[in-house]
Amino acid sequence: MSEIEEKFNESSYGADSIKVLKGLEAVRKRPGMYIGDVGDGSGLHHMIYEVVDNAIDESLAGYCDLVRVTLNKNGSVTVSDNGRGIPVEIHQEEGISAAEVIMTQLHAGGKFDQNSYKVSGGLHGVGVSVVNALSEWLELRIWRNNKEYLIRFNNGITEAPLAVVNEDINKKGTEVTFFPSVETFTNIEFDFGTIEHRLRELAFLNSGVKILLVDNRFEEAKEVEFYYTGGIEAYVKYIDRAKHAVHPCIVVNTENTESGISLELAMHWNDSYHENILCFTNNIRQRDGGTHLSAFKSAITRVITSYLDTTGLNKKSKNDFSGEDTREGLCCVLSVKVPDPKFSSQTKDKLVSSEVRPVVENAVYTKVLEWFEEHPAESKAIIAKIMEAANAREAARKARELTRRKSALEVSNLPGKLADCHAKDPAISELFIVEGDSAGGTAKQGRDSKIQAILPLRGKILNVERARFDKMLGSDQIGTLITALGTGVDNREFSLEKLRYHKVIIMTDADVDGSHIRTLLLTFFYRHMPELINKGYLYIAQPPLYKVKKGAAEFYLKNEQALQDYLIKSTINDATLTLDGKEQLVGDNLEELINKVVKFNGLLDHASKKFNRSITEILAINDLLNNKIFELESDSRLQKALDVLNSLEESPDKTNWEVLKHENKVEFFRFSRGLKESKILLKEQLESFEFVQISKLALTIFDIFDKQLKLIVKSQEFGILTASQLLNAIIECGKRGISIQRFKGLGEMNSNQLWETTLDPAKRTLLQVRVAEVDEAEGIFSTLMGDVVEPRRLFIQANALNVVNLDV
């Protein structure tokens, strides 16, 4: 903090620094022009980003090193920083405080005065006033001049002038709390994951700034800290955490003093077959690239050409390389700071500042070529990868030519297994990609042949994450799919205009095998036809796993979770849980308990692979699945838990469970026909991820299961000792009077059932595939489908809690 405080200079950032371009009415009339889409959630989240960007501008100027974003219980958001604090003096032109000017006048702020900020982000350069205009209410607190100032707004209108509410405050900074307007936004619920991604991105781009994200909306608060001293080099390693790097990161940091443009670059080649380049200007992502991206690509091609010519390595190559070959497996984060950037649109998705290109191209060419010359061994490995890419591209070209020659001799270019639709208009045509010939036959009978085409895929789908392009083209299933779609597949041939269907629907079984095939197909589309996803043409069908019949009524349920939910809901209104014969849980209170028990049950199922499930549950609901089990004071509680366990597992062939405590382990044992059965619980296991989560959840239901419980459903009574007993009793009661049919696959349905549940546009449910954050999607596909095991293990461990029922 001391360095930041030393840089503080009130006179350099005061009311005179605030420049004004007036008018807020247009913001309320056309909010989408200023904040983004108000219907899909992007504009809502940009409200937070606009305020955060102002704090980051303070950090870029050297005055702020801590930003905090808090999602409050009432639905509002608070963003605070420890910067200089917004100026509070009276603005000469406006006659009101500078803080009020900033919050009520469009295009008002320090970023419009070049002496205040050298470079700045901000969403659209329209200022935080847009956030105020689109908020039901907003509260601004400022700590400056050893005082605390407060001003409030309703629908963008000032309640009262800025006022001092505290004095002798040894603090500097700004805090904005706002509640989005329900009249503007379709939905005002913020998504933690979306915000988390953007804040992590900002923390990587602004090394040394600590960003805290706190979610207070739920019973258990959630807090994530983002702080990276490694900057964008750490960002590249984070993005590529599931891949093998060919060499250490190449890092470039340079500034052009004449133009004021600075460049940060971190890059490395990995063992994958896909390029991943992220471009930023003043901390804002350009998804469509621009002059900085063009300059970078040109520079890299020049570097490789120059290095090959200098070393003579080009003589070893069988094929000439292209720019695409040089970028195969390249992961790069390119961040430029530009004093006055120009973009192609309000959303800043493409940089068009022409002065950026020569600065970036010259800097990248000079510095990266220098690195190549200083690291001959690593450079040789990179060149070998590029040559391999060129050879694979040539092999793919020959494979395509062979395919074209074969197609020219055929009467129809469409694959034989495709049952095409009659419609020729892609806008109304649908293609169902179906798992297997059996399901394909049923789908062909049940479809609406006017608009629905069926393509059955039989056999193993290729994992394109681990396959080169030429190998992919050699796959029968992938080749059939490419031909049916009609678009071509690589950058040279792909044409979205040639797509024959504007709904491409993946329809697989609702089991683990179906999920795996679906993931393989999603990997193909993400890697080789991302345009289909971007345009919203790719969907996932939702076939049911169960058919339930109750009396004359029949209905379908999507999966195990939906069936369990139905059985619980059909029982809960007729159920009463009595505690010690006195207190009763019914209705919403009982449902709340059951929801916790369902999650608890799922955790126990997951942990049962590592330790006995029954023992784990008994210890957890007695608050003993932790180090308390080693304490003498817990012996009576442990014996009570064993008594319950033995009553549940009573058997004439087995003795009761007994326990022996050791220094670092607890042994549970019993004898079955003279043979000893032993379960060892190690002290270190108690600190494992699974057991800690089970213990946390068990504490929320501990008080209930510490009592004598009786479940009454209609006229039937059940004695309840454990959470599993309670859940099983509820579910079994729900099964009475109904028949349940489980479909093992789509082929088990008849054509009418498939039409009613999955094909009929009027009744079906489709999930549209969208990629909200490209680099997060990149990481997930690399983690799940790549060949690095450790990141996949960590991913499964981290997300295990989200799986309540796993159908295996």
From Swiss-Prot:
GO terms for molecular function: ATP binding; DNA binding; DNA topoisomerase type II (double strand cut, ATP-hydrolyzing) activity; metal ion binding. Residues 429-544 form the Toprim domain. Its EC number is 5.6.2.2. The record marks 460, 463 as: Interaction with DNA. GO terms for biological process: DNA topological change; DNA-templated DNA replication. Mg(2+) 1 binds at residues 435, 509. InterPro entries: DNA_gyrase_B_C, GyrB, GyrB_hook, HATPase_C_sf, Ribosomal_Su5_D2-typ_SF, Ribsml_uS5_D2-typ_fold_subgr, Topo_IIA, Topo_IIA-like_dom_sf. Its cofactor is Mg(2+); Mn(2+); Ca(2+). It catalyses: ATP-dependent breakage, passage and rejoining of double-stranded DNA. It is found in: Cytoplasm. Mg(2+) 2 binds at residues 509, 511. Few gyrases are as efficient as E.coli at forming negative supercoils. Not all organisms have 2 type II topoisomerases; in organisms with a single type II topoisomerase this enzyme also has to decatenate newly replicated chromosomes. Belongs to the type II topoisomerase GyrB family. This is DNA gyrase subunit B. The gene is gyrB.
